[in-house]
Swiss-Prot record:
Gene Ontology cellular component list: cytosol
GO biological process, one term: response to amino acid
Keywords, comma-separated and alphabetical: DNA-binding, Repressor, Transcription, Transcription regulation
Entry annotated with the keyword Protein transport: no
GO MF entries: sequence-specific DNA binding
Phenotypic consequence of gene deletion: Leads to strong induction of aspB3 and OE_6130F.
The entry's DNA-binding region: 22-41
Name under which the protein is recorded: HTH-type transcriptional regulator LrpA1
InterPro entries, per database record: ArsR-like_HTH, AsnC-type_HTH_dom, Dimeric_a/b-barrel, LrpA1, Tscrpt_reg_AsnC-like, Tscrpt_reg_AsnC/Lrp_C, WH-like_DNA-bd_sf, WH_DNA-bd_sf
Gene: lrpA1
Biological source species: Halobacterium salinarum (strain ATCC 29341 / DSM 671 / R1)
């Protein structure tokens, strides 16, 4: 048996395959199905598991461009700007960051031109947003 805790083994199985059945997770984590169910229910209730998602290869999506956008925000307008960014349909994910930018956003649009329009017309139009630095995703490597 692994030195990882039961919770860590269950979470690792879910991170590898969010669609895995309780039976598959139980086998991988070396616990019973009821134990898996109990842990998952508790982790969801505690807000540790906040959702399940699919990993998407952007190159296989026809007619869609994806960029990770570093966003700089005036400190005094951070909360409101963040709320507004969260409401944009084209922003698929938004993260606070300790790197070069205060926020990192995954932005999707029909193509590169549309993505540029979203950044200039929507993201940069938000009060408090001082700069946006897009990096267009080319190929998923892992």
């Amino acid at each position: 048996m692994s030195t990882e805790s039961t919770e860590e083994r269950i979470l690792a199985a879910l991170e590898e395959d969010a669609q895995a059945s309780y039976a598959a997770i139980a086998e991988r984590a070396d616990v019973s199905k009821p134990t898996v169910r109990k842990y998952i229910d508790q982790l969801e209730s505690d807000g540790v598991i906040v959702g399940y998602s699919a990993d998407v290869d952007p190159k296989k999506l026809s007619g869609q461009s994806i960029a990770m956008v570093g966003i700089d925000v005036a400190s005094e307008q951070y909360v409101e700007a963040t709320r507004t960014l969260q409401e944009l349909d084209s922003v698929q994910a938004l993260y606070s960051s300790s790197g070069d930018h205060m926020l990192m956003a995954e932005v999707r649009a029909a193509d590169g031109d549309a993505l540029g329009d979203v950044i200039s017309d929507e993201v940069l139009a938000i009060d408090g947003v001082t700069a946006a630095h897009p990096s267009f995703l080319q190929e998923r490597l892992k």
